[in-house]
């Protein structure tokens, strides 16, 4: 090793925890029938192979380490699926900022309110900010009233984290989502109505022609 150079620790290969690559002498072996036994690794491997399975070290830091007799291919698939499902369930909460002016018109207000509703339904927090310029800071109460109105319009979707605060030339308020309203799945498509009678599809029948007298 060259002096002054730091090398990252060697990554453990998953294959090192399978069959003959297991380096510990003794394991707590778990078998498909639910039985567990502390035994030499060689004996556990032999028993797993008799069952047509692999011996996989699933808890290398336990005392003694735990090894399980499984199909390694299926084990890897199940492990990746569990990791994928766990990542899907995780939601990183973000703070979405919406900026207003003290004289924000109704159209801009409604536009930003719709965005805030969507952000809250997605599980994110919303930070509404009123920015003051020049002498507008003398009317900071107008900005606070706007924020209170905004928070009141979102009570069905979020809860306010305290009263509006003035910091420098900005007033802001934080709104957290209501957990029961967080969208986790796509809405179901409405079912198509079934036609009750065949005649509705074919249209009205033609009346019979009058018979010749």
Swiss-Prot record:
Sorted alphabetically, the Gene Ontology cellular component annotations on this record are:
cytosol; membrane
- Any one GO molecular-function label of the UniProt entry: translation initiation factor activity
The UniProt entry's GO biological process terms, in alphabetical order, are:
ribosome disassembly
Q: Where in the cell is it found?
A: Cytoplasm
Which keywords describe this protein according to UniProt? Cytoplasm, Initiation factor, Protein biosynthesis
Major subcellular location class = cytoplasm
For region Disordered, the annotated ranges are: 178-213
| Ranges of biased composition (kind: Basic and acidic residues) | 182-201
Entry-linked NCBIfam families = infC
Sequence similarity: Belongs to the IF-3 family.
Assembly and partners? Monomer.
Function in brief: IF-3 binds to the 30S ribosomal subunit and shifts the equilibrium between 70S ribosomes and their 50S and 30S subunits in favor of the free subunits, thus enhancing the availability of 30S subunits on which protein synthesis initiation begins.
- Its protein name is Translation initiation factor IF-3
Species assigned in the record: Solibacter usitatus (strain Ellin6076)
């Amino acid at each position: 090793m060259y002096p002054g150079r730091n090398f990252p620790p060697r990554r453990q290969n998953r294959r090192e925890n399978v069959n003959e690559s297991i380096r510990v002498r003794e394991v707590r072996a778990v078998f498909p029938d639910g039985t567990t036994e502390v035994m030499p690794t060689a004996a556990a491997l032999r028993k797993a192979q008799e069952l047509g399975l692999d011996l996989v070290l699933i808890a290398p830091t336990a005392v003694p380490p735990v090894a399980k007799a499984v199909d390694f291919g299926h084990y890897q698939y199940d492990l990746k699926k569990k990791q994928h499902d766990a990542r899907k369930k995780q939601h990183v909460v973000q703070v979405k900022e919406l900026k207003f002016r003290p004289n924000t018109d109704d159209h801009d207000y409604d536009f930003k309110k719709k965005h805030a509703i969507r952000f809250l339904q997605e599980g994110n927090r919303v930070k509404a900010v009123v920015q003051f310029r020049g002498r507008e800071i003398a009317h900071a109460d107008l900005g606070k009233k706007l924020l209170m109105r905004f928070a009141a319009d979102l009570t069905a979707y979020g809860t306010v984290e305290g009263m509006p605060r003035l910091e420098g030339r900005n007033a802001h308020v934080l709104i957290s989502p209501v957990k029961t309203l967080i969208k986790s799945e796509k809405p179901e498509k409405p079912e198509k109505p079934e036609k009750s009678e065949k005649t509705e599809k074919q249209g009205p029948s033609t009346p019979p022609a009058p018979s010749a007298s």
